[in-house]
Amino acid sequence: MSHGFLLHICVGAQFAGYEVNVSQVQVEINATPTVNSQPFRAADFATLTEALDYAAKGATGSNFYTGRGAIYASLTYGELREQALELSHKLLGLGLNRGDRVALVAETNPEFIRFFYACQYAGLIPVALPASVKVGAHAAYVAQLKQLLQASDAVAGVASEGYLPFLQEASEDLSMRMVDVPEAFHALPGDEQPLHQARPEDISYIQYTSGSTRFPRGVVIKHHTAMANLQAIIADGLKMNGKDRMMSWLPFYHDMGLVGFVLVPMCAQVSIDYLDTREFAMRPRQWLNLMTQTRATISFAPSFGYDLCARRVRPK
């Protein structure tokens, strides 16, 4: 997997005047358990939707932490499936057709995962866009988004309030059906038409390369390709079992983050704990703290992450 994203990690909370909101913990939230009630299966499914249908029967899921190590959101796979199914009808209510591309600014939060799987159930194709703006690089980031929107032929776009102005500016001259925040899509009326049953030969998502040496190249991933890769990672590469727990700070728009820490845990029915990439860059110790706190058994990163810990983390 390419490691080009490491050159673009941002540690600021404001870019070109747009504030990227940081979630605050208001109520006590319990993390999903490590022990699952469902028998472990090593991604022996035909499609991602079949994998989520199975994972949803257990109690495991995804958890999201602030830079201070406090959990601010938790989403079981059962809740994810239910919410993704509901959202899939709302996306189809826009008049989107099977095979249409939906651009998702891939921040490390539950909304990206909800929309990614909603697209799977609706027969739409999610395209993960980078959520990474270097300070003073407003124009360059907008240009990058515009090129990705054009290259992917996206018909709708989703971004948080912090990133929406960039995405709207990038889509100004494009014929897109809707570009808005997640809440606006959730508020749409649903379409009650039967959902498309995903087939192994259907396109699941489009993954763009890092583009560290040239403009990012889109790779079309079909369900059968994704599942073969995931099964190899889970069964042969990581040799996972039902007692594992994962932890990651890698961005969702990067292949190692999307495949390794969004798709793998769900297809293995294990819980995962997330720390935002920006928060890791500011507080690398938190990666180590959270692995200890959650008793994670699996976490990996490019060499940059270990180097940052070695340089910035000092014994207490």
Annotate each language-model stretch with its function.
Residues 6, 10-15, 93, 121-189, ...:
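Structural core segment of the AMP-binding/adenylate-forming
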Residues 60, 189-215, 225, 229, ...:
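Conserved pre-ATP/AMP-binding loop-to-beta segment of ANL
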Residues 63-117, 134-141, 192-198, 221-224:
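Conserved AMP-binding/adenylate-forming core of the ANL superfamily
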Residues 106-109, 116, 130, 249-257, ...:
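Conserved AMP-binding
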Residues 109-134, 144-156, 244-245, 263-273, ...:
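A short helix-loop-beta submotif of the ANL/AMP-binding
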Residues 228-245, 255-297, 308, 312-314:
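Conserved AMP-binding/adenylation subdomain of ANL enzymes
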